[in-house]
Amino acid sequence: MKLLSSLALAALAAQVSGAAISHKLDGFTLREHADASKRELLQKYVTWDKHSIFINGERLMMFSGEVHPYRLPVASLYIDVFEKIKALGFNCVSFYVDWALLEGKPGHYTAEGIFDLQPFFDAAKEAGIYLLARPGPYINAEVSGGGFPGWLQRVNGTLRTSIGDYLKSTDNYASHIAKTIAKAQITNGGPIILYQPENEYSGACCGYEDFPDGSYMQYIEDHARDAGIVVPFISNDAYAGGHNAPGTGKGAVDIYGHDGYPLGFDCANPSVWPDGNLPTNYHTLHEEQSPTTPFSVVEFQGGAFDPWGGVGFAKCAHLLNHEFERVFYKNDFSFGVTFFNLYMIFGGTNWGNLGHPGGYTSYDYGSAISESRNVTREKYSELKLLGNFAKVSPGYVVANPGNLTTSKYTKTADLTVTPLLGESSSAGSFFVIRHSNYNSQASVKYQLTLPTSAGELTIPQLGGELTLSGRDSKIHVTDYDVAGSNILYSTAEVFTWKKFDNGKVLILYGGPGEHHEFAVTGASASSVIEGSSSGITSKKIGDALVVAWDVSSKRRIIKIGDLKVFLLDRNSAYNYWVPHLPTKGKAPGYVSKKAIDSSIIVKAGYLVRSAFLSGKDLHIQADFNATTPIEIIGAPSSAKNLVINGKKTKTNVDDNGIWSASVSYSTPEIHLPSLKDLKWQSIDTLPEVKNSYDDSAWTSADQPHTLNTAHELQTPTTLFSSDYGYHTGTLLYRGHFVANGKESIFFIQTQGGSAYGHSVWVNETYVGSWEGSGSNDNYNATYTLPSLATGKKYAITVVIDNMGLDVNWVIGQEGMKNPRGIIRYNLAGHDASAISWKLTGNLGGEDYRDTVRGPLNEGGLYAERQGFHQPKPSTKNWDSSSPFTGLTKPGIRFYSASFDLDLPSGYDIPLYFNFGNSTAPPDAYRVQLFVNGYQYGKYVNNVGPQTSFPVPEGILNYHGTNWIALSLWAQQESGAKLNSFELINTTPVLTSLDKVKSVDQPKYKSRKGAY
């Protein structure tokens, strides 16, 4: 561990005075001041002041996006996501760790294979991305239990408090995960620069009054420090509440941060921006709550979740689109945010039952990078404009935010301007303009009156007016430094600038139909060296050359001394990329002034991942979804050849030194199997309803008391599944009784989370189902029973679809302890105690059998308990029948088939399994989709909305055999079948991505003790 020397440690201990906190670290005792704002640093790499974070002594704007490694279980695809984030101009990624996946059994921590975090850390380092680690223990994250393993339902104590045994239950996980993270800190050459203890520790209810509990937070922080965490602690208050900010005493973090989801989650109305939802007081609150730390928004809305029965993530992407980014993100910039993390930048998939019941399999989130990892959403391109601007604008980081005004800088109250002023008139200032009614769709003409080093100027100076279109916002700059050239002002926005061997380049852009103006101090003349001069005028005013221009879809370049100004429309700017050009090797390295200065500008299409120089060859690694013209702006003088994705490419060089080339794209031939024509084999996966079924191997539900402290029993023995170690997937119950002839009805209340369902049989007679809805997490059902023979033994079989455990966002509410299973029941003519119950879930419960795919992937269906969802199941005694034929009565059937793929190499080809439904109203049935043993889809036909399930390469074998399996659960008298089920692809992307490695896919083998 590259920590402090023993001498430095001793000196540090001697320096700290007052009430102190002790940590054991590498054999030394460290004592920290209880007040985080007065602590000495434990390392020298990551520091901060009121403006920003410093890394290795260099002040940085941290632009970050949220990625969850557990939602993409293919390690060789991590680099793809990181490179796409790096290409945005970002320099950081935040990630959660899901405790429930790593300690499925109390005391048994395992983080191997797809759950190993080291490949994630390695990919971040390779891409040059810093990391913020957020291991909880509580994470929320729309995962089952908010990241809590199901066995916490049995913990005697209040979750997320010091009450009872909760904190003790976190010890094993907390120490293991913190040690893993500690090894990957920047102090050890790793990418991790910040650590967040707990998550959104921001509110309590239900009689819990000791909030916020500094001792509770301190316990979590101590665990991290004791395990070797030396990077700064940062928080993410759910709102700007000041909880655990520096100076608040025990449990205070080093850097205070908060979240913001101001537009909400109404994806059903994607064009509606409600009045009053734009934050206006973030800076004021920051100055009140944590003025000595950089303003940090640790989660800001990058998309939205969508519930069962929702409208789908396409509409969420529309709600939180490029217009949202322009208005809301620039508004955050107006407050001087310098740690800015977007939740999510890539959402991924809730595979293997890892999601909470409020969401379905997809966790696309409407984010900039889609679930299938494509970057075709306009919001990705818009974000690239802002990310690259932030990267080349060091003056922004130290500018001082002022108060918003509708009169000081413009003459119309329809517009609001918030200034970020430099320390002096020549230090560079930024002015964020938006509609006063932020949701206005009107187009407003305006002029600006701005302070500059040349005095106060009214702009445009050469006539005309500026325009702010509806749902738009701009950042105007004054005294903006471009490698020694002073841009006195620019009304057009800056994308990037660079100083090259042959001069400087500045790229400005504007919206369609806009008029803009910029001025360059000390310049006297300009010339248009590319494109038409129509719509461009210039004039020397005072010591500056003023240039006015009308936005055009055709690029113009103006030369002013050694400065070339590229004038673009916004859509054209989307095609520009600014990859770092490392001075040695291929890896781009982390962001630094040196890395920024050595970058080149590439005009391309779909994606530019990276660039590097090898001898006289300039290499560009890029992806293409169409034939694309390429331009290199600022190629090093030592470069003589252009190599794109390993192929030397013919180039032309124009009079301005711009290299041009072209990459041809042709759609490859892709042959996908017809799933309807596969050789399907099937088996009844509900043998439990047969009179001959023997459930003697099942768990007896005979505990007279529940260990769940949040819910009282309403049954003679507990039927809460987690009391018996079953926390995931389908649950089955069998209740045995002797009939007395009075059994006219059966009442049952079950609980399984949103969109869950249940079905009930008495012996082999189907009596009914709750088909599910997006709004019910439990249901009371009363069923009429057939006449039963007095004195005969009967079994009631209840199948319950567990949709995941609830999150525990509000302390004291104990949402995670909401049980799954049977809550209460009544059989007419019998006392409740007359029924003796057995239950099962996944085979082994917490002693789960498939340690490769983890503790949540399997549920309790017979086929799952046997392992038939894995590749090459034993189908000797199965039937030859297809899910397209399905069932003719209520029940559950399991289907398995295989197919081969041999897809073209060199392409990233997104594949989807699509379910179709042509009936109205929709038939009531449920399907689980397993791909090579991984549950990669949970489809509820009558609830929705998800019908298309992307499965990444690595789970699917693109060059080999694949096994798919389906469980088809019919919840209606007529049975169910699949009307349509297809494997489809979207546009193949010609890619420079390295070959994707398939994850471990253990094949079926007979399971000892399976029943």
UniProtKB/Swiss-Prot annotation:
Alphabetically ordered keywords of this record: Carbohydrate metabolism, Disulfide bond, Glycoprotein, Glycosidase, Hydrolase, Polysaccharide degradation, Secreted, Signal
E.C. code: 3.2.1.23
Binding annotation for substrate: 96, 140-142, 199, 261, 365
Places the protein is found: Secreted
GO biological process terms held by the UniProt record: polysaccharide catabolic process
Gene Ontology CC entries for this record: extracellular region
Disulfide bonds: 205-206, 267-316
Catalytic activity: Hydrolysis of terminal non-reducing beta-D-galactose residues in beta-D-galactosides
Signal peptide segment: 1-18
Active site as annotated: 200, 299
A GO term for molecular function: beta-galactosidase activity
Sites where a glycan is attached: 156, 374, 403, 625, 763, 780, 917
Protein purpose: Cleaves beta-linked terminal galactosyl residues from gangliosides, glycoproteins, and glycosaminoglycans.
Family: Belongs to the glycosyl hydrolase 35 family.
PANTHER family: BETA-GALACTOSIDASE RELATED (PTHR23421)
Protein name: Probable beta-galactosidase A
Organism placement in taxonomy: Eukaryota, Fungi, Dikarya, Ascomycota, Pezizomycotina
Gene name of this polypeptide: lacA
